[in-house]
UniProtKB/Swiss-Prot annotation:
Residues with attached carbohydrate: N38
This protein's name: Kunitz-type elastase inhibitor BrEI
PROSITE patterns: SOYBEAN_KUNITZ
Cystine pairings recorded for this chain: C41-C88
Note in the entry: On the 2D-gel the determined pI of this protein is: 4.56, its MW is: 16992.79 kDa.
Organism: Bauhinia rufa (Orchid tree)
Pfam families in alphabetical order: Kunitz_legume
Function: Inhibitor of porcine pancreatic elastase with a Ki of 27 nM. Does not inhibit human neutrophil elastase, bovine trypsin, human plasma kallikrein or porcine pancreatic kallikrein.
GO molecular function annotations of the record: serine-type endopeptidase inhibitor activity
Family the UniProt entry places it in: Belongs to the leguminous Kunitz-type inhibitor family.
Amino acid sequence: ASPVLDANGDPLVPGGQYYVLPHIWPGPGGLSFEKTGNQTCPVSVFQLPRLPLEQNNGKPLVFTPVSETDDINEDTAVEIAFAEPPSCAESGKWLIVNDFKEEYWSVGIGGPQDHEGYQTLTGYFKIHKVGSFAYMFSFLPFVR
């Protein structure tokens, strides 16, 4: 598998901090966490809006390979977490959340107790190359 590359063309380093930005410029901003609904802690992952004259980078993420290797490769399982999560959350680790009403799922952070009243799925993510200069994430739920 090929290594996942940063904007400079260098392989991602496990434990390093990276901003996830859209590949279109100008475009929306990077990723951050916010409060939604009746949350008292900002545990919902959002893409920030574009700022008029500057890039809105959002908050840095850390990628951790799940396999025995120390490499972060395309199409292999990784954990994704915000480097500096809010202190009220269990962690900055990503998970999938559903409110039982909508047909779509969203990305949150922390643990199930951070999303009381919601269905949560924990698991890993894969990073897939899309075109020449972009990547997308997919989710791999833990099977019980």
